[in-house]
Regions:
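The short coil/loop that forms the "turn" connecting the two helices of the helix-turn-helix
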Residues: 2-3, 34
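An amphipathic alpha-helix adjacent to DNA-recognition modules
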Residues: 4-9, 21-22, 42-66
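Pre-recognition alpha-helix immediately N-terminal to the DNA-recognition helix
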Residues: 6-14, 85
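Helix-turn-helix
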Residues: 14-48, 52
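Short, hydrophobic secondary-structure boundary micro-motifs
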Residues: 97-102, 183-186
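Amphipathic alpha-helical packing segments from all-alpha helical-bundle domains
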Residues: 104-156, 160-171
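C-terminal peripheral helix-coil segments that are non-catalytic and often amphipathic
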Residues: 123, 127, 157-229
Length: 229
């Protein structure tokens, strides 16, 4: 367990500071002060670390969305808040964008996302698509996850602003789940009224602290300062 803790601590630091693709296994082993065989026995590969971290991060996002939402908000609004948070987090730091995009690119983490999200989508949007089974929602999630990956991959600029990205994504994804146009408009207007960058910054720090608490490692100033570029 001590070796696993050191590896996770090293990966959180290196992934945040350098990105997933910018971090090598050799750098992780050196930072964690473990042998190559220990790393392979615990995680097998860098993808194994990503899977474990991603599972925790995605679960934490749903919890964070509930703290942002008002008590009377609909499940569809909660979905909009959670997905808007994820898109905004990837705009805070290109290395975080790299982590999230990779999570949507590797078979193991993609399948985790599909399966864990399907039940949530069925609960949220089942009333909009009453004839659909969980299997149907699994198939829809494959498509909506592809939309999410595409929008995360493309960074914002002076023309394609965060607000435009959120509006485009939410209109497309809510349409997939048969949310009526007037309700989509109300949800999108509400999201655009929120200071999503400030909310996402706060949520990001909470998520990383939750990671530290869950995997029992200490955060330091370097990790904290690297979160938001």
């Amino acid at each position: 367990m001590a070796a696993k803790k050191r590896i996770l601590t090293a990966c959180v630091r290196l992934f945040i500071e350098r990105g997933y693709n910018g971090t090598t296994v050799a750098e992780i082993i050196k930072e964690a002060d473990v042998s190559a065989s220990s790393f392979q026995n615990i995680f097998r590969s860098k993808d194994g670390v990503l899977s474990e971290l991603a599972a925790f991060m995605f679960a934490g996002q749903f919890k964070a969305a509930r703290t942002v939402a008002d008590p009377g908000d609909s499940p569809a609004m909660l979905y909009a808040i959670e997905t808007a948070l994820q898109l905004t987090i990837t705009e805070l730091n290109d290395n975080l964008r790299d982590i999230y995009v990779e999570a949507y690119s590797h078979e193991a983490t993609m399948e985790y996302i599909y399966q864990s999200t399907t039940a949530e989508l069925y609960r949220i949007f089942g009333s909009y698509l009453p004839d659909y089974t969980e299997s149907d929602f699994y198939e829809l999630e494959i498509g909506s996850a592809g939309i999410m990956r595409g929008y995360m991959s493309r960074g914002c600029d002076m023309y394609f602003t965060l607000e435009r990205k959120l509006e485009r994504f939410l209109n497309m994804s809510l349409s997939v789940y048969n949310v009526p146009e007037d309700e989509r408009r109300r949800i999108i207007d509400r999201i655009l009224e929120l200071d999503m960058r400030a909310i996402a910054t706060s949520v990001l720090h909470e998520l990383v602290q939750m990671l530290a608490d869950h995997f029992d490692f200490a955060l330091d100033d370097e990790i904290e300062s690297a979160l938001v570029q």
